[in-house]
Amino acid sequence: MERTCYNANLSINDIGRTVTLLGWVSRRRNLGSLLFIDLRDRSGIIQVTVKDDVHIPDVRNEYVIQVKGQVAKKDVPNPKLKTGEIEILASEVVVINEAMTTPLIIDDETDALEDVRLKYRYLDLRRPTMQGKLKTRAKIVRAAHEYLDAHDFIEVETPILTLSTPEGARDYVVPSRIHHGSFYALPQSPQLFKQLLMIGGLERYYQIARCFRDEDLRADRQPDFTQIDIETSFLDEDQILTLMEGLLKKVFKDVIDHDIVLPLRRLKYDEALNRYGSDKPDTRFGLELKDVTSIVSKTSFPLFNSSAYSKAIVIPGIADRTSRKNIDELQLEAKKFRLSSFIVLKVKNNRLEGSAAKFFGDGEADALLQLMSAHNEDLIIIASSNSLSNVCFGLGALRSKYARELGLIKPNTFDLLWVVDFPLFEKDQDSGKFSPLHHPFTRPTPSTADLLASDPGNVHASAYDIVINGYEAGGGSLRIYDQKMQKTIFEILGLSQEDIKNKFGFFIDAFKYGTPPHGGIAFGLDRLTMILSGTDNIRDVIAFPKNLRAACPMTDAPSKIDKSQLDELGIKIIE
C-alpha cells in the first residue's frame, strides 16, 4: 500500500511536497466549505484540510483512511502538535476500513475506567500516550542490547517449562499430558539456569526474560513480567555494580536524555531502614526517622517502657489540619505493622498536645522537641515495638504517604542508589523459621559466613538492590559456588535431604565440576519503563497486562477448559 512517510516526518521544510499518508481519523470538523480531519498514525497527528471542491466519501472517527495531498503552511499554527505548523491540502481521501463508535475516547485524556481500557486494549493502545510508553520500553531494551553486547555478554534463552523449586512466591504450574500427575512450573526467574550457564563456562550471559509469579498484585506488580537478566563470572561486587552503573547511564541517556552522575550512592540496609523506614528508600525528600527510645522510655507511658525500639518522624505544618478522624486512620494503618504503641502528638506553643502528651514530663517533652527539630504546628508520630523492622517499616510507610500528600517530591527528578549489605535471612515472628531475604543462592559476606552454623540471623548477604525514586528497579547478588555451603543454606531453611535432592539435586550435582565465582542482577523492565515514563501504574507500560485480580478482561483469561482436555491431562475438577 502506497505511503510516502509518517506524519511526524513532515515539517515546514516540506511545503509544496505531494505526499500519501495512512492512518486513523482522530477527529473531524465540518465547517461546510471546509472539512478538517486530524489524521493519526503511530508517529503523531497531522491536520488534513478538504476543500468543498474535493469530493470524498463520508469519514468518521477511527475510520482507517489513505490521504493524498500537498503539504501547506497553516494559517494558525498549533504549538501542541509536532506538525502544528503545517497541514495537508487533500486531493484524494480513500476509506480503507470503517469503524463502529468506540467504547472509549481515543485520546490521551480519556475518561474510561481501567477495566474498560483493558477489555478494549487494542483501542487503548491507539492513544499516543500509550504508544509513547511502549516506545520507551523498546528503547530501554535496545540500549540494554547495545551495552551488553558491547561488553561481551551472550544472549541465551532459558527454559519456560521447568521444575517447581521453592524461590519465594508461588509457582504457576502446567500439567503434563505425557506424564500424567506430573507438572511443569513456569519460571519465577531464570536463576538456576543462569548459574548453570556460568558453570557451563559462558562467563557473561544476559536475556530479556519472561518470569511468572503467583503472588498478590499491586500497582507495580504483574503475574507475568519481564526482566533484563544478567549473570557474570569472576567479578566481585564492586566490579558488577560498576558495570551495571554503566548500563543504567546508557539507558537514562538514550531513552530520556538524562545524565546520571556516577558512581551511585551506596546505602547499607541497616542505614536505609533506620533513616528512611524502607529497604527501597526514596531520598528525594527528608522526613527521616529518629531514634527516640532513650527519651520515651523515661516517660510514664507503659507501652514505651515495654518496647525495645521507639522511633519518630515529624510531619511539618499539618497539626491544625489533622483531625481525630485522621489520627484514627493512622492508628488503623499502624495495626498492619503490629506495633506495640503508636501515638500522634501536635506541637502547639512550643509544647506537646494530644492524648499521650500527659505521659511526657517537661524534660522528656523538651528533649523530644529538640531531637526532632520540631516547630509549632508540626506533627510528631512515635511508633514502638520489640521488632525494629516493624517500627521502621511502619513509619516508613507513613513517611511516603505524607511526602505524596504534601507535594514534597520534586517532579521529573531521579534518585538512584544502591542498597547493600542486606541480612541473608529474615525470621518469621510467629514460627521462628528462617527464609531467604532474597533467594537461597545468595552468598554470605566473607566477614559473616562463619556465623551460618551458630547465628544465622546475623549473617549478611553479598546482595545489592538498585533503587530508583523509591522503587526497587533491580536486584542481585554474588552467588554461592561451594556445594557444602549451598547445602548448609538449604538446611537452615528447613529443607530435608530428600527435599534438596528432589528439588535441587541437578543443581547441587553441577557444583561438583568446578564452579566459578559468579554473580548477577536482574532489572525489572516493566518497572524501569514505568519510572522513565513517569507513571505509577505498571499496567500502563505493558501491551496486554492483567488487572489486579490477575485476569485479562479482553480475553477472559483465566478460563475453564473442555472436559476432553482435562481427561487428556488426567485431571478432574472437584467443585
Where are these regions (language model features)?
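Class II aminoacyl-tRNA synthetase catalytic cores and aaRS-like
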Residues: 1-575
